[in-house]
């Protein structure tokens, strides 16, 4: 009997020891990576694209006995960026050293702005650029505007002011932005390098002074916006304080509308649910692209989502060349991981890319497709998307929706 008691006592003691070791390793300063925060965790990328459905992960509370000071975070981040980019090829950017691209050193970062609309592949493209070390990712700064397209004043004035301020790392006076983020955490969580410090102190994400200082540490900035049309960005391109390039991402309206069917946020909004408004914006963007490509050579790029999905590696390197960025190992790993596996979730960026762009052919009813094509005929012709003639033609393997296109002024 005594031996049995001793045996059970030893088992219990051993079990408690294992639990303590595991707990200690999980919360050690240099290893703590909660599953919903890890930048490389699969679930990180199963996010609501634009946050119209609440992101389920709250900002984590501090699990440490003490909170790192702002100065410690700034210094640690500065050192980390230097280490991660110690072998980076800056020659593509025209810079000789890292400091030339840092605002805190008086330099100009390389800045990119992705312009598109809902469900057009911006989440994937944004994550591609965010995979490059030293990138500060401004995710959807206009979330607070709701499910609307901003096509002109007065909303465009406020929207462009917000975009300019963020690209200049000046978050002063942006109380609306921070207040929205207090209840919509995805506004911050996509910016993985900022979010990584919110787990220590959630107030950091709402601190304009910290966010401004933190932003100025980074040599690369990328921003994605799905609520502003291309013709409005001329004001940004004219701003001499910015080192900005603009990338317009277009997608087949049939694929866009098929993808939007899965989003409950979309249906109440005419801007999101009416294909005629989507295609009117596509025509507007086509006209603006012709004008801006002529006026700002080498600063505007046009890309169809299907090209990125069908050949992500080659297309990504075209984008990098346009942005004057160099490929990195982390970017190559991201592309390999995110384009060769399928993970469930309508906002997942883990997809077998070649299967995504033409999914609409097999899941949409032809009558609905025909309705889209009727109101989108001109937009589809301009952007090089072929028409489906009937249900049999639409579903056939021989029907390739992509055609050539040319942008003219």
Residue ranges and their predicted role:
Residues 1-112, 118, 185, 194-195, ...:
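PAPS-dependent sulfotransferases, especially Golgi type II membrane carbohydrate sulfotransferases
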Residues 9, 195, 200-202, 209-351, ...:
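PAPS-dependent sulfotransferase catalytic domain
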Residues 111-113, 134, 243-247:
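Beta-sheet entry/capping signal
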Residues 118, 139-141, 248-251:
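Glycine-rich, histidine-containing beta strand-loop boundary motifs that form or position
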Residues 121-122, 319:
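Conserved G/P- and acidic residue-centered "switch" motifs that form tight phosphate/ATP-binding loops
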Residues 123-136:
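A conserved segment at the C-terminal end of the G1
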Residues 136-230:
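PAPS-dependent sulfation machinery
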């Amino acid at each position: 009997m005594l031996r049995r008691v001793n045996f059970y006592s030893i088992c219990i003691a051993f079990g408690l020891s294992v639990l303590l070791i595991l707990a200690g390793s999980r919360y050690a300063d240099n290893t703590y990576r909660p599953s919903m925060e890890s930048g490389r965790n699969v679930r990180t990328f199963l996010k609501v694209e634009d946050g119209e459905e609440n992101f389920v992960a709250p900002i984590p509370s501090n699990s440490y006995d003490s909170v790192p000071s702002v100065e410690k975070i700034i210094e640690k981040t500065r050192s980390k960026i230097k280490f991660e980019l110690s072998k980076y090829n800056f020659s593509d950017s025209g810079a000789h050293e890292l400091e030339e691209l840092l605002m805190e050193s008086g330099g100009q970062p390389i800045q990119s702005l992705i312009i598109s609309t809902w469900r057009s592949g911006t989440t994937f493209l944004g994550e591609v650029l965010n995979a490059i070390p030293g990138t500060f990712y401004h995710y959807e700064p206009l979330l607070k505007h709701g499910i609307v397209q901003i096509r002109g004043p007065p909303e465009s004035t406020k929207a462009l002011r917000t975009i300019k301020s963020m690209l200049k790392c000046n978050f002063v006076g942006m109380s609306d932005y921070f207040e929205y983020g207090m209840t919509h955490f995805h506004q911050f969580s996509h910016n993985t390098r900022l979010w990584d410090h919110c787990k220590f102190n959630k107030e950091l994400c709402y601190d304009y002074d910290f966010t401004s200082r933190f932003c100025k540490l980074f040599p690369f900035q990328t921003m994605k916006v799905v609520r502003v049309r291309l013709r409005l960005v001329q004001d940004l391109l004219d701003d001499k304080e910015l080192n900005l390039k603009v990338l317009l991402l277009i997608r087949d309206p049939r694929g866009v509308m098929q993808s939007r069917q899965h989003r409950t946020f979309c249906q109440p909004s005419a801007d999101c649910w009416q294909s005629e408004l989507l295609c009117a914006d596509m025509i507007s963007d086509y006209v603006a692209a012709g004008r801006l490509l002529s006026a700002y050579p080498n600063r505007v790029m046009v890309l169809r989502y299907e090209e990125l999905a069908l050949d992500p590696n080659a297309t990504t390197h075209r984008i990098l060349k346009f942005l004057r960025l160099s490929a990195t190992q982390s970017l190559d790993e991201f592309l390999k991981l995110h384009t060769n596996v399928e993970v469930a979730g309508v906002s997942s960026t883990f997809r077998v890319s070649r299967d995504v762009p033409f999914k609409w052919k097999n899941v949409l009813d032809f009558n609905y497709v025909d309705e889209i094509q009727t109101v989108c005929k001109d937009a589809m012709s301009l952007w090089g998307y072929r028409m489906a003639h009937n249900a049999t033609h639409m579903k056939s393997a021989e029907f390739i929706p992509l055609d050539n296109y040319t942008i003219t002024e």
